[in-house]
Amino acid sequence: MLRIFIPTSNGKISRRRYIFSFILINFIFAFLIIFFNDGEAGFLVIVSTIVLHYLVINMNCQRLRDSGFIYIKTYVFGTLAVYIISIITMIAEDFACSGNGSMIFLICYFSTFSMLMLAPTDSSKQ
């Protein structure tokens, strides 16, 4: 479980561990963000959000590698581009939760999770 914190060029994660880790990390960081937000610790909310997305991107890269995907940098840069576009759109919409920026981010976030949850394991490298 701890290897999801360390980016590697050859780390892989199985489907079952990916689903469990994704759900667990999202719940833990959701509670942390809510707790820090209620205590008005804005810096800790930002740090928790950055660590959450770092872990999710790292887990997704490991799951992509387990599925046989070899262009990991394409995924990372594409995800960062979606994050930046979402943030710019949210700023333009005055951070409205029902705006397009939030929807772009959520669609990307959960469609990636769904795709990787259903992705087969690469059988050619077993």
Curated annotation (Swiss-Prot):
Membrane-side (Cytoplasmic) residue stretches: 1-18, 62-67, 122-126
Question: How does this protein sit in the membrane?
Answer: Multi-pass membrane protein
Principal localization reads: membrane
Q: Which GO terms describe its cellular component?
A: plasma membrane
- The UniProt transmembrane annotation reads 19-39, 41-61, 68-88, 101-121
Q: Which UniProt keywords apply?
A: Cell inner membrane, Cell membrane, Membrane, Transmembrane, Transmembrane helix
The residues on the Periplasmic side of the membrane are 40, 89-100
Q: Where in the cell is it found?
A: Cell inner membrane
Q: Which NCBIfam families match?
A: PRK11371.1
Its recorded name reads Inner membrane protein YigG
Organism this protein belongs to: Escherichia coli (strain K12)
Its ancestry begins with: Bacteria, Pseudomonadati, Pseudomonadota, Gammaproteobacteria, Enterobacterales
